[in-house]
């Protein structure tokens, strides 16, 4: 009888151990699944945010290209000289805004700035300008703009009044009749914050 009790107890212990192991495995699998689901959701959100941002700044530049084209068409009809047409376009672009703080800049193919908020940079050559990391961002912006459908450029710069660099993303496109590259862009901290959450999410779920 005593031996039977020992065998029963042994069996119960084995069953309990197996049950605990099974529960632990279920917890690990569940946690991993939650982490995967969370990361997949963040992937979708991040991709949507990046796509939406890219579409917005590209659409804004395309609108300005259309403005330049309409002015150039009037030049071709003899309403303006070429210099007058370029000045009219530059003056209008300088005043354009979108969103909270969106604006546009214009540079010639050789890097001479035509439009930048009316500040002292206008009229100077910034082809060799570099960002905080030493990246020649203006060369990249101009080269991207001269592609058939324009292009995007990522670089880093401190916000006004700050010393720490923040990521920026620009879209630029050429308007060949004037020999210009038009661009706009903005800081992308909000999108990068989603990427950071993506990287830290598994750890948070496992705690």
What spans do the regions from the language model cover?
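Extreme N-terminal signal-anchor transmembrane helix of membrane signaling/transducer proteins, especially
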Residues: 6-37
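Extracytoplasmic/periplasmic sensor domains and loops in membrane signaling proteins
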Residues: 79, 83-91, 120-160
């Amino acid at each position: 009888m005593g031996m039977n009790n020992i065998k029963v107890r042994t069996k119960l212990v084995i069953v309990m151990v197996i049950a605990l192991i099974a529960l632990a495995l279920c917890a690990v699998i569940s946690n991993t699944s939650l982490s995967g689901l969370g990361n997949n959701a963040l992937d979708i959100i991040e991709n949507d945010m990046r796509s939406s941002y890219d579409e917005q700044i590209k659409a804004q530049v395309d609108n300005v290209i259309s403005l330049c084209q309409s002015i150039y068409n009037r030049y071709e009809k003899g309403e303006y000289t070429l210099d007058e047409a370029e000045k009219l376009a530059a003056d209008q672009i300088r005043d354009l805004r979108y969103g909270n703080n969106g604006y546009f800049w214009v540079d010639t193919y050789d890097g001479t700035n035509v439009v930048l908020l009316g500040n002292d940079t206008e009229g100077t050559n910034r082809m060799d300008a570099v960002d905080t990391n030493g990246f020649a961002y203006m060369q990249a912006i101009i080269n991207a703009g001269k592609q058939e459908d324009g292009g995007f450029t990522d670089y880093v710069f401190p916000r006004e009044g700050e010393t720490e660099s923040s990521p920026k993303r620009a879209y630029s496109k050429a308007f060949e009749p004037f020999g210009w590259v038009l661009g706009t862009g903005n800081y992308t901290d909000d999108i990068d914050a989603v990427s950071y959450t993506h990287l830290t999410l598994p750890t948070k779920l496992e705690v």
